[in-house]
Structures are given as C-alpha cells and as structure tokens.
Amino acid sequence: MQDATFDQIFPTSQRCRSYLHWTPVDVAMRAVALLAPTRCRVLDVGAGVGKLCLIGAANTGATWVGVERDAEMVEIARRAADCMHVEHRTQFLHGDIRSIDWSTFDAFYLFNPFAEILAYGPADALTRRE
C-alpha cells in the first residue's frame, strides 16, 4: 500500500504532515517486522496520528502504544484505530514521554519525534507542557 492511499483515513488537515513527519508505509512495515516478530508491547514515541501503531496492529499480534503530546493527533489516532478495527491492539496516550514507564515495553520506536518540537527553538522545546 502506498502512503497516499493509507493516509486517506486521516483528516485532510493532517495529511500535509505525512511526507515530512510520519513514518512511510514501507519503513513502517520493515520496523514492524523487526520490532514485533512475536506478541509483545511496542512503544511509539511521538506517535502523531498513530501510523506505525495502526500498521503494526493490523499486521501483528503485538500491542502497540503510541504516546503523543498533541491531543488532536491522539484523537485522530484513536478514530483511525476504530475505523481499521485494531482498537483492541492499540492504545494512544496524550502526554509526555517522561511520564511513561518504559520498563513495561519490549521494543521502542522513534521516527522523527522531536522535529516539530525543535523547530520552535531549544528553550521552547525544554518547556514542560501539560
């Protein structure tokens, strides 16, 4: 499947981010094969709209958890999981990675999770947001 086809499940307002910020489908498929060859828990840091988690849940028996600080993206990811019928193998958390217990996961994925934060400048990137 091509990115443009997959991205149709997301709102038009978010699709413009795909080429720059979201994991391409071919990369996601390779990452899924490497991270979750068996039933395990995978954490996607800076999950955005959940593209990796959605692809992972659709193609493995693993549990995929995405953490994202943008509440709108978390809601979009949850709706996409429902649409794809993978909500039972995905969880999308609105929050900061510093509040996550990393010891409960078997694998981790970070694809460009800090690009948007760093674009605002170092001082703003270090400011804790609730």
Residue ranges and their predicted role:
Residues R39-G48:
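Conserved class I S-adenosyl-L-methionine
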Residues T63-E68:
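Conserved SAM-binding motif I beta-strand of class I
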Residues I117-E130:
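C-terminal substrate-binding/active-site "lid" region of AdoMet-derived donor-dependent transferases
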